[in-house]
From Swiss-Prot:
Phosphoenolpyruvate binds at residues 339, 368-369, 390. This is Enolase. It comes from Synechococcus elongatus (strain ATCC 33912 / PCC 7942 / FACHB-805) (Anacystis nidulans R2). It is an enzyme of class 4 (lyase). SUPFAM superfamilies: Enolase C-terminal domain-like, Enolase N-terminal domain-like. (2R)-2-phosphoglycerate binds at residues 167, 339, 368-369, 390. PROSITE patterns: ENOLASE.
């Protein structure tokens, strides 16, 4: 009997569902000959990098304001024809077949949303067929490291309807002994922050990723609020709970200038702003500190701050191994944000993570601002021993679903579970 007996793909179906913003996205099911079923849902970003794989939308103004994904759903039928009868255990072969079927560099024909939904659903089906949790199927026996969460508790930029320029102000429980405790610490700081905001007469409505979205006088004020909340919750800033930012600077870059807090800056001035913030606050990670194509200044930023703080490329690298390789060769950044839908297949995502690891770069597994109840990224973080995960704040169930999945994984691992903050895989507190 062949090793892949029963794991052949028998059927692939897809449907249009809604994400956390009420916009359509793609859900796929992969059915195997042995009756195993894998289900996956694809997220969608608000601030998207220019070089991301193509998210196929219908552009029909009569449905969902043109945001429908019926074309992508229909394209899954063509994918099914190409993959039927193949083994779900051959993830790389299946992903290559879909890439070849699409025939474009950015998956524009079939849509990265169609391809990724099938890619992930296939992995889930294969894991189910082997009676393994997804993290164990993908990561093998060494998949036992729980990531330090980057908790986006103050939202700005494209993720919120407020006047804050920087997109995310995050807390990282780097000093916690376990993921369970890290989650508790984060939740306590989140609720302390709510009280701090109320006491100051500031809004406590939340943005796309579940963080608060008050109007503030400056980006620095957001950091001050986080320090106040951390201390109010009984923790030590830096040592126990560190700070991180997603500047998302491409969103306020125009004609060679960065405009934040109402002032336009040359690239050197923007680097100076970030350096000042790092010197004044216990910041351990900065994402997209400069514009996605500003490679020369990214190199300068890395030379100035790379030994002090984690510099994460999101729009810069877009989970693309070719762009990451360019960054490695030029000495740009020291970490890569991993978003499955930026590249469009599980295989290419794993290749990017592997390249980062071999090159001394860290990987941060990430959600998108438009999410679903899918928890694949939680398993991916553990499978790859990435050590860090970005999956939003401590509210909105599409964010909490990932945290709760990590709690279940930690419980299943028992005494074999390691928390990245406790063993030094996450950014160090200072």
């Amino acid at each position: 009997m062949p090793d892949d007996y029963g794991t052949q793909i028998a059927e692939i179906t897809a449907r249009e569902i809604l994400d956390s913003r009420g916009r359509p996205t793609v859900e796929a099911e992969v059915h195997l000959e042995d009756g195993s079923v894998g289900l996956a849902q694809v997220p969608s970003g608000a601030s998207t990098g220019t070089f991301e794989a193509h998210e196929l939308r219908d552009d029909d103004p009569s449905r969902y304001g043109g945001k429908g994904v019926q074309k992508a759903v229909e394209n899954v039928s063509a994918i099914e024809d190409a993959l039927i009868g193949l083994s779900a255990l051959d993830q790389e072969g299946l992903d290559k077949a879909m890439i070849a079927l699409d025939g474009t560099p950015n998956k524009k024909n079939l849509g990265a949303n169609a391809i990724l939904a099938v890619s992930l659903a296939t992995a889930h089906a294969a894991a189910t067929s082997l009676n393994l949790p997804l993290y164990r199927y993908l990561g093998g026996p060494l998949a036992n490291v729980l990531p330090v969460p980057m908790m986006n508790v103050i939202n700005g930029g494209a993720h919120a309807d407020n006047n804050v320029d920087f997109q995310e102000f995050m807390i990282m429980p780097v000093g916690a002994p376990s993921f369970k405790e890290a989650l508790r610490w984060g939740a306590e700081v989140f609720h302390a922050l709510a009280k701090v905001l109320k006491d100051k007469g500031l809004a406590t409505g939340v943005g796309d990723e579940g963080g608060f979205a008050p109007n503030l006088g400056s980006n620095k004020e957001a950091l001050e609020l986080l320090l106040t909340a951390i201390e109010a919750a009984g923790y030590k800033p830096g040592e126990q709970v560190a700070l991180a930012m997603d500047v998302a600077s491409s969103e306020f870059y125009k004609n060679g200038l960065y405009t934040c807090d109402g002032v336009s800056h040359e690239p050197a001035g923007m680097i100076g702003i970030l350096a000042d913030l790092v010197s004044q606050y216990p910041i351990v990670s900065i994402e997209d500190g400069l514009q996605e194509d500003d490679w020369s200044n990214w190199k300068t930023l890395t030379q100035q701050l790379g030994s002090t703080v984690q510099l994460v490329g999101d729009d810069l690298f877009v989970t693309n191994p070719d762009r990451l390789q360019s960054g490695i060769e030029q000495g740009v950044g020291n970490a890569v944000l991993i978003k499955l839908n930026q590249i469009g297949t599980l295989t290419e995502t794993l290749r990017t993570i592997d390249l980062a690891t071999r090159s001394g770069y860290r990987s941060v597994i990430s959600h998108r601002s438009g999410e679903t109840e899918d928890t694949t990224i939680a398993d991916l973080a553990v499978a790859t021993r990435a050590g860090q995960i970005k999956t939003g704040s401590l509210s909105r169930s599409e964010r909490i679903a990932k945290y709760n999945r990590l709690l279940r994984i930690e419980a299943a691992l028992g005494e074999n579970a390691l928390y990245a903050g406790a063993i030094g895989l996450g950014p160090k507190g200072r």
